[in-house]
């Protein structure tokens, strides 16, 4: 896979990876640039969160906005135009991926923002006896209702770009294990991550999955996409795997599960 390094800042901060995508004109690149993650380097700032700028077949797609306006500031330094984004996608309803949605809407006056239908202001993490709110910025769903599109089931944004929900049963047990909850009808229930979705691109090498946290399990997500497109190869998965709080044994098990899927590229 070729690697494009555009300047010293990008070289230090990230590697922009190109996966060729076939169209009538031959092969055009898909370029994914990390705008924000938890690593700061040089002029680029970092924070607990993620935002990825994806260029595909002449369209610009933003995945998540991170936890502050740093995604937009880094985008300017990386010469990526937030104003030129055609479509925005929210991976899941947690603050570190959504808190700067308002910043995006203020900078971009036209792109729809795709959220899974399960996204509400109701995500919490439990520590001891306390439930801490970790969800969407308050009132974002009403303040920008005209810019938000809710997705249900398998959803095609444009040809070759898809949003895929979880299809693995009983994911509420993941919520139980991770002490993540949703509040519904004045009661606490384990989060089943019905608000999480995968952003999938069809490329010449195969399907490429972007999932910012993989709360539902990275191997589950690979298998979900594979089952959705049974005649196509799942080539790669890019994003966050939420392994920072896992034991060495748990991480080894996840690595083996990923290997068992037969996927070629992991980032």
Where do the language-model regions lie?
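Active-site metal-binding motif and surrounding structural segment of the metallo-beta-lactamase
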Residues: 70-120, 227-236
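Glycine-rich phosphate-binding "P-loop"
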Residues: 28-42, 179-190, 239-245
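Cap/insert and terminal regions of metallo-dependent hydrolase folds
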Residues: 95-97, 190-267
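Active-site-proximal loop/helix segment associated with metal-binding centers of metalloenzymes
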Residues: 129-131, 141, 153-205
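Hydrophobic alpha-helical segments and helix pairs
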Residues: 111-152
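Conserved beta-strand hairpin/beta-sheet module of binuclear metal-dependent hydrolase folds
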Residues: 30-77, 192, 196-211
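N-terminal amphipathic/basic-hydrophobic helices that include classical n-h-c signal peptides
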Residues: 1-28
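Metal-dependent catalytic neighborhoods of phosphoester/phosphodiester hydrolases
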Residues: 99-108, 132-133, 247-253
């Amino acid at each position: 896979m070729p690697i494009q390094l555009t300047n010293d800042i990008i070289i230090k901060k990230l590697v922009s990876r190109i996966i060729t995508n076939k169209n009538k004109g031959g092969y055009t690149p898909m370029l994914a640039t990390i705008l924000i993650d938890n690593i700061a380097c040089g002029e680029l700032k970092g924070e607990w969160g993620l935002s990825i700028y994806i260029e595909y077949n002449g369209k610009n797609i933003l995945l998540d906005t991170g936890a502050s306006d740093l995604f937009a500031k880094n985008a300017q330094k990386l010469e990526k135009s937030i104003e030129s984004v055609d479509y925005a996608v929210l991976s899941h309803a947690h603050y570190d991926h959504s808190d700067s949605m308002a910043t995006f809407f203020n900078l971009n006056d036209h792109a729809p923002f795709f959220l899974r239908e399960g996204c509400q202001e109701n995500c919490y993490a439990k520590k001891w006896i306390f439930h801490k709110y970790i969800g969407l910025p308050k009132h974002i769903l009403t303040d920008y209702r005209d810019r938000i599109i809710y997705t249900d089931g398998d959803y095609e944004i444009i040809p070759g770009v898809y949003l895929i929900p979880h299809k693995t049963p009983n994911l509420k047990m993941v919520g139980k294990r991770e002490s993540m909850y949703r509040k519904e009808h004045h009661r606490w229930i384990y989060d089943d991550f019905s608000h999480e979705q995968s952003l999938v691109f069809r490329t010449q090498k195969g399907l490429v999955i972007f999932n910012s946290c993989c709360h539902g399990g990275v191997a589950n997500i690979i298998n979900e996409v594979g089952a959705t497109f049974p005649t196509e190869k799942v080539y790669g998965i890019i994003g966050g795997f939420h392994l920072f709080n896992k034991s060495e044994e748990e991480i080894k098990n996840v690595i083996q599960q990923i290997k068992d899927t037969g996927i070629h590229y992991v980032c």
